[in-house]
Amino acid sequence: MAVQKSKKSRSMRGMRRSHDALTTSAVSVDATSGETHLRHNVTADGYYRGRKVINK
């Protein structure tokens, strides 16, 4: 089992954890259907940037 040579300070622990923050996902509204969707993704009904790209 790995054992550290010396105790890590609160500062070093905080610096390591500085990249662990969660961000909210970017959501946008489709111009045609008005449906909310993730950015750079097709909506549930098949629209992307105002155009129908998936026919069901």
UniProtKB/Swiss-Prot annotation:
Polar residues: compositionally biased ranges: 21-33
Record-linked InterPro entries: Ribosomal_bL32 (IPR002677), Ribosomal_bL32_bact (IPR044957), Ribosomal_zn-bd (IPR011332)
UniProt entry keywords in alphabetical sequence: Ribonucleoprotein, Ribosomal protein
Entry keyword Ribosomal protein: yes
Ribosomal protein as UniProt keyword: yes
GO molecular function list: structural constituent of ribosome
Protein name: Large ribosomal subunit protein bL32
Gene symbol of the encoding locus: rpmF
